[in-house]
């Protein structure tokens, strides 16, 4: 399956890192008809994390609870946390 990420950050045409904004549906099953669909969502999220890990691509995951905190300093801090993965 094709893995889609919310944002890709490039510098000089080189991928620097990926960003995933994770809404509430990534944490609680109430957005889904069945538990199985929720578990598929979690599997898809884990596939993205594993892809980035295997390909040494830094992945910033922003939980919906941080929505009002997002600014350039927030992103820089998150990048510093993941850049050497």
Place the predicted regions along the sequence by residue.
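Nucleic-acid endo/exonuclease domains
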Residues: 1-85
């Amino acid at each position: 399956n094709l893995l889609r990420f919310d944002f890709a950050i490039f510098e000089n045409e080189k991928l620097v890192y990926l960003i995933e904004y994770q809404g509430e549906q990534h944490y609680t099953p109430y957005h889904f008809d069945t538990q199985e669909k929720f578990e598929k969502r979690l599997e898809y999220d884990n596939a993205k994390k594993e892809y980035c890990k295997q390909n040494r691509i830094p992945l910033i995951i922003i939980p919906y609870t941080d929505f009002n905190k997002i600014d350039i300093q927030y992103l820089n801090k998150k990048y510093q946390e993941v850049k050497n993965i």
